[in-house]
UniProtKB/Swiss-Prot annotation:
It comes from Halalkalibacterium halodurans (strain ATCC BAA-125 / DSM 18197 / FERM 7344 / JCM 9153 / C-125). GO terms for molecular function: double-stranded DNA binding. GO terms for biological process: asymmetric cell division; chromosome condensation; chromosome segregation; regulation of DNA-templated transcription; sporulation resulting in formation of a cellular spore. It holds the Pfam family MerR_1. InterPro entries: Chrosome_anchoring_RacA (IPR023522), DNA-bd_dom_put_sf (IPR009061), MerR-type_HTH_dom (IPR000551). CDD domains: HTH_MerR-trunc. The keyword GTP-binding does not apply. Keywords: Cell cycle, Cell division, Chromosome partition, Coiled coil, Cytoplasm, DNA-binding, Sporulation. Required for the formation of axial filaments and for anchoring the origin regions at the cell poles in sporulating cells, thus ensuring proper chromosome segregation in the prespore. Binds in a dispersed manner throughout the chromosome but preferentially to sites clustered in the origin portion of the chromosome, causing condensation of the chromosome and its remodeling into an elongated, anchored structure. This is Chromosome-anchoring protein RacA. HAMAP family: RacA. Belongs to the RacA family. GO terms for cellular component: cytoplasm.
Amino acid sequence: MAVQWKTKEVSEQLGVNPTTVQRWVKFFGIQCETNEHGHLLFEKEHLTVLKAIQNQLKSGKKMRDVVIEENEQLIQKPETQPMVATEQYEQRTKQFMEKIAELEKQLSQKADDVVSYQILKHRAEIDEMFKTLQSLELRMAKVEEQLEKQQEEFPLAAGDVPKRKRSFMRLFSF
């Protein structure tokens, strides 16, 4: 069995952070074994590939420009998806646009329905307030009539003081 290292040990040998090693493995599709805990296990060939990547990055290359020539069997090439025909793309785009227009129309209709409902509710509230106001006006008119009758029947209740009492009160006021 070949010697295997964990991510931390490889990162120490390369002088980089363990997450950097994990990022390189993921980005370049390096095929590594994992242990029962899910930790990556590296062999000598993996270390050689990672050193080649590190050297190219140190020389100023960007990750997308790095070329791996050694141990290519360790690298999983991403599958390329076929291009979509222009007519098919335009047809799908047209379908999406029609669907979006339909959804916008439904949304607008729903908004109109909500506003109509709110207006009807407000109208009902206004009608109820108007009825309450009319009722209050009638009650107020009745109270005013009763007050006028009381003033006619009982003049003293309206604040009229007989003249005799007024003169008596003047004697004691300063």
